[in-house]
Amino acid sequence: LIRRPLFSFLTPTRIFDQSFGEHLSESELFPTSGALSPFLLRSPFLRTPSWL
């Protein structure tokens, strides 16, 4: 029997339905990471300042 958390609508249900032998891909865990990563890598806020 699979028990779900009280606020299951806030979290992906795929994680709770997963069996232990099954692999979860990064795209299933973070579906927007592929779309955001080019912007995050080019973001000036994440670069080391030139005065350091």
Curated annotation (Swiss-Prot):
GO terms, molecular function: protein homodimerization activity; structural constituent of eye lens
Domain of life: Eukaryota
Keywords for the protein's UniProt record, in alphabetical order: Eye lens protein
The keyword Ubl conjugation appears for this protein: no
Record-linked Pfam families: Crystallin
Keyword NADP among UniProt keywords: no
Functional note: May contribute to the transparency and refractive index of the lens.
Assembly mode: Homodimer. Aggregates with homologous proteins, including alpha-A-crystallin and the small heat shock protein HSPB1, to form large heteromeric complexes.
Family: Belongs to the small heat shock protein (HSP20) family.
Protein name: Alpha-crystallin B chain
Gene encoding the protein: CRYAB
